[in-house]
Amino acid sequence: MENKLIELIETYNDFPRKGIEFKDVLGIIQEPKIFKELILKMSSSQIIRNAEAIISIDARGFIFGSAISLEASKPMIVARKPGKLPGELSKKKYSLEYGENSLSIQKKCLQKYNSYAIVDDLLATGGTVSCVSKLLESNGKEVLGLLVVVELMKLKGRFKLKFPVESSITF
């Protein structure tokens, strides 16, 4: 399956900024059989099985997180960029490969579950995932691990994290 996935991922140089090599995973969801195979594989992870809930990161993480959530029969919580969630929020700033941003999670969602699997499309520097894990931990929650479709090994994001990382493809 790895070779099929690699074929479906397009690389865009200098996007969204000069010097960035953007890996576009959207080709995967255009191939339902491969997408389903990927979701079945990711859903069977011990990290997913042991978590009470899945937390997916804005925005491409939602695609994979929601499908995994359905397949694994686990609730999904979202971590969103500024101005996207109503209600009382838990917020945190983080650094990107190409700038700075922040993420928010609705506090009412965090009250329901104690252990989480983080799902995203891609792991680069680890800044976004680290932000989510710190948000969860600051609310007394446990991060069991991260599942991503793509991991950019040269950026060494996994080494900044204190929990297991499972990636379907590495570049």
Curated annotation (Swiss-Prot):
The protein's UniProt keywords, in alphabetical order, are: Cytoplasm, Glycosyltransferase, Purine salvage, Transferase
Q: Which domain of life is it from?
A: Bacteria
Provide the E.C. number(s) assigned to this enzyme.
2.4.2.7
**Location of the protein in the cell:** Cytoplasm
Pathway as given in its UniProt record:
Purine metabolism; AMP biosynthesis via salvage pathway; AMP from adenine: step 1/1
Say where the protein is mainly found: cytoplasm
UniProt KW Cytoplasm keyword? yes
The record's subunit annotation is:
Homodimer.
Q: What's its job? A: Catalyzes a salvage reaction resulting in the formation of AMP, that is energically less costly than de novo synthesis.
Q: What is this protein called?
A: Adenine phosphoribosyltransferase
Organism in which the protein naturally occurs: Prochlorococcus marinus (strain MIT 9515)
